[in-house]
Amino acid sequence: MQCRRQVRMCWPLLGTALLLLLPGPPLSCAQNVSEYQVKAAYLYNFSKFVEWPAQAFASPVAPIRLCVLKEQAFESELNQVVKGKMVGGRAVTVVPVQTAEQSLGCQILFIASSQDKQSRQIIDTLRNTSVLTVGESEGFLERGGIINFVLQDDRVQLQVNHKAATQAGLHISSRLLSVAKLVIQ
């Protein structure tokens, strides 16, 4: 009798566990996923598909620094994505920056469209460094930026300036290049 009672008590728990295992809606259908959440996930994943020269880091165990230029809302979104994550044995950290000079120790720098007027000067300052510059504005690649986010049909798409990446000493994985909507050789 006691066994039956225990089994009956387990059914609700088993049912709940099975519901949790069912797949949810695809990411593209999820209404609560913001554009910045998608871009933050991309930035984190760039750290997995881009190789930097050894001199781009202060030491062999230095973290991968994802820097955000003057954009607190995006910075907090990115912090949520990378919290506690490691890539290639390195911790991933988010660093707010205010100037191009502060970006010199970064591996990735995100320049929001709100900072578009500064982007040319920042890209010029970082041109001969191994900083992966990522933007979200028209003409970003033409100014020498390396990766640009564009919205098309409510989807975040990538454009890549492979030539600028090579000049910066960065190696972008063919897997990342294959998902780009546009690649400038």
Predicted features by range, described:
Residues 2-185:
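Short hydrophobic alpha-helices and adjacent helix-cap/hinge residues
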